[in-house]
A protein has these predicted regions:
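Short S/T/G/P-rich N-terminal loop/turn motif that feeds into the first structured element of a domain
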Residues: 1-34, 47, 85-89
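Short, well-ordered beta-strand segments in beta-rich or mixed alpha/beta enzyme
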Residues: 4-8, 42-64
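Generic detector of leucine side chains in alpha-helical contexts
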Residues: 5, 10, 20, 52, ...
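Charged/polar, solvent-exposed surface patches and flexible loops
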Residues: 23, 27, 43, 67, ...
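Glycine-centered loop/turn motif at secondary-structure junctions
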Residues: 36-38, 73
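A short linear hydrophobic-aromatic micro-motif
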Residues: 38-44, 78
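An amphipathic, aromatic/His-enriched active-site/gating alpha helix that lines ligand/cofactor pockets
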Residues: 59-85
Length: 89
């Protein structure tokens, strides 16, 4: 299944917000899976200098990755397919 990178804004002074968003992302992915669309939350990467947080999901399509991000309340700036090392086509 492809992986998708969800880019979001996260202010430097937003202590604890990343953990809350990760919990919502995990819950939204679980909910979509129960509804029949297999989605998995893979983790996040925070870049405090740029005030960006990237969330990664395994999902069938860009549309599904965007939907899980929306359900999690992540307010994505963009959603793009990402290919982890070792999985190049």
């Amino acid at each position: 299944m492809p992986s998708y990178l969800v880019e979001t804004f996260l202010a430097r002074d937003a202590k604890g917000e990343r953990r809350l968003r990760e919990g919502r992302a995990r819950s939204a992915a679980d909910e979509m899976t129960r509804e029949g669309t297999r989605v998995g939350f893979e983790g996040s990467i925070y870049v405090p200098e740029d005030e960006l947080c990237f969330f990664t999901f395994a999902a069938p399509s860009t549309r599904d990755a965007a939907l899980v991000a929306q359900r999690a309340g992540l307010a994505p700036l963009r959603v793009v397919e990402a290919i982890p090392s070792g999985k190049e086509e």
